[in-house]
Every structure is written in structure tokens, then in C-alpha cells.
Amino acid sequence: MKRFKKVYIEITNICNLHCSFCSPVNRKKEFITLDNINHIFNEIKDYTDYIYLHVKGEPLLHPDIDKIIELADKYNLKVNLTTNGTLLKEKINLLLNKTNLNKINISLHSENDKENYLDEIFEIRDNYLKDKTVIYRLWTLNNGKFDNNSQEIVEKIINHYKLSTDIVDNIYNKNNINIDKNLYIDKDNEFEWPSLNNNVESNGYCFALKTQIAILVDGTVVPCCLDSDGKVPLGNIYKESFKDIVEGEKFNTLKKSFEDRKPSSELCRKCTFKNKFN
């Protein structure tokens, strides 16, 4: 078994939506080059089998998304794609016949003005992606309930797929629900992006650096996909080898602090997402 269950790779930090729960990007806006992504794949190929092409940004905005997936295949890397779905219809031809495209997570939002947004997503999934695992991601309030806008999305899913009463009940009572062949609903509470401005600090365990690690578009290696501004840099994969980074002092000091449930990083202490694991 390889060291990491997954590696997040940010191929762009540019997004075409401005959702209220998503923190703004305070870094230079850019797209990764094919040379740089090829370098990253070569560096990480012995450390994971699965890559997620996002930290921040909408991956389908990348003009070479098809070439990136094809490059990953040369390194036997399986690709999990997370998208807001608004560009699926426009870019679907670039995703077809990609045997290493393992899973597509579609984060369903009410915060866009695109007409027939959900209808387009349903159409693309039903006509082109039935052989792929597709997950409709829904966000709930902290009490696990849907707000009015999310409830409308749920009702459209129920009506489109003509879901049975049992499946509908599961949507409200469970977090991961199989609603059709290779099609799932995954729901989770909206979370607060970690920030040094957060007032609350806490100790606790985290899976960062044990099962996952992330690489920002500028090459900065960070503990997880929630360090969206690179506040906990462990190194830069364009300047040093991935091997040296994961065997380095910064990496191992932080990893041990997670194991001891006393994060050495201020950002990690102020991250509330780790409370899910404690």
C-alpha cells in the first residue's frame, strides 16, 4: 500500500463562482503548466494511487484538463474530479474515454445564476457518465438540516430520478446514499475554512499527513486541502523533491504533533474541521 490514500493537486486557483461559504483566494491567480503537472506526477507516483485535482478553484476551467488526466494515466494515477458542475456540458467531450477518471464529485450549489443548472448536470450524468462513479455533494446547516435552497435541489433530484420513499428517507437520515447505479448523494455540514483570524484554538487528531497531503498551484506542499493559502508550507515541489519534503523535519514534526493530538501549527489548532475526528 502506498503512503497516502490521496494527494490533492491544485491545477488552478481560479473559480467561476463566488460561493458564500468558500473563503477568497489571496494568492496569485494561475493555471498549472503541463510541464509542472508532469513534474508533480513523476514526484508523487510512488506515494499514492489517487489524486484529487483541486484545493481551490474550478478544475474544468483549466484549458488542458483533458491532457492533465491523460498525463496522470501515464503514471498510473487515478483521477478524482471535484467540480461545481457549471462547465460540465461545455467540457464533457474532454472527459470522455478517460479510463483513469475514477470519480466525479459535483458540489451542487444554489449560488449561481445559470439557467437550467441542475437539468444540465442530470442530463450529462445520465447520458455520458453512467459508467463512472458520480457523487452529488450537498451541504447542510450545522444541525444537519437543509436550508430552503438546498431543499429545492433535493426535491429536484427526487423528482428527476423518481426516488422511492426508502431512498428519500435515507437522504434525510444518512450522509451517503446510493440513489442509482454508480450515483450517490453525499451530504455534510458546511464547514468553516481555517484561518489565523479564528478566535478559538483546540487540540485534537487529524488525518493530514497520514492519509493525505496537498500541493498548491505554485508548488507549495501543505498538510491538507484546507490550507488554501499555504499558511503551513512544508516545502515546494518545484524546488525540492517530494521525497525530501515528506522525510523532512517540518513534515515529521507536524505529523507527530497530530498523532499526539497537539498540533504544532497555529492554523491547525484554529481549524475546526478536525473536530470531526475527535
Give the positions of each predicted feature.
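Short cysteine clusters
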Residues: 15, 19-22, 206, 224-225, ...
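Structural recognition of alpha->loop->beta junctions
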Residues: 45-46, 92-114, 151-179
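Short loop/turn microsegments at loop-to-beta-strand junctions
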Residues: 209-211
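Conserved strand-turn element in the central/C-terminal portion of the radical SAM core barrel
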Residues: 106, 111, 125-159
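Short, acidic, Ser/Thr-enriched surface-loop or helix-capping motifs
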Residues: 215-216
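C-terminal accessory region of radical SAM enzymes
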Residues: 128-138, 156-201, 226-276
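Conserved alpha-helical substructure of the radical SAM core
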Residues: 1-104, 112-119, 278
